């Protein structure tokens, strides 16, 4: 299924670089890493977005990516930082993308945390998903994908988060309410 980008890919990339440059200095090496992994991150988002029935993620039988839709942009920033970390190893720009995600939407999802391939955010603002998420077992990851267990699977206990997989209701809810 193709992805329809609201605006254009070039426009989304220009917006990202403007956001990053407004907060940080972006070197040519960092910009090249963004260029190199932008398409891969977009493809990872498209694969995940195509599995959801959320009306904001599809349009005319195609997956929709809107850089101005906060949940989608947060997910994209994570995916881009993750792709650059795994493929390019330019951690300085990964740190800046992570910080931008925190500044833009208060989403604390570190790029070294390997999330499931298919998941979505539903009102993620203020969510914290940290390094403990990498300690999942294969059973826990299976459960996380099916939505059958609680927040401790992803190390999110005692944190409010509306992290969702494409097939589940919220995996993590407030343990403090």
Which role does the model predict for each range below?
Residues 102-177:
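Structural signal for interior beta-strand "rungs" in well-ordered beta-sheet cores
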Residues 1-103:
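Terminal amphipathic alpha-helical/low-complexity segments used for targeting or macromolecular assembly
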């Amino acid at each position: 299924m193709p992805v329809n980008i609201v605006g254009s890919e070039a426009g989304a990339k220009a917006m990202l670089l403007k956001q990053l440059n407004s907060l940080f200095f972006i070197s040519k090496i960092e910009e090249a890493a963004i260029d190199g992994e932008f398409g891969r991150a977009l493809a990872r988002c498209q694969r995940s977005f195509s599995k959801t029935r959320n009306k904001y993620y599809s349009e005319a039988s195609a997956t929709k990516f809107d850089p101005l839709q906060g949940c989608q942009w947060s997910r994209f920033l994570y995916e881009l930082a993750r792709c650059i970390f795994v493929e390019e190893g330019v951690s300085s720009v990964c740190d800046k993308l992570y910080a931008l995600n925190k500044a833009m939407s208060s989403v604390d999802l570190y790029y070294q945390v390997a999330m499931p391939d298919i998941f979505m955010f539903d009102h993620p603002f203020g969510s914290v998903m940290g390094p403990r998420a990498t300690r999942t077992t294969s059973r826990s990851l299976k459960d996380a994908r099916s939505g059958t267990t609680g927040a401790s699977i992803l190390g999110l206990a005692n944190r409010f988060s509306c992290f969702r997989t494409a097939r589940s209701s919220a995996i993590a809810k407030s343990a403090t309410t």
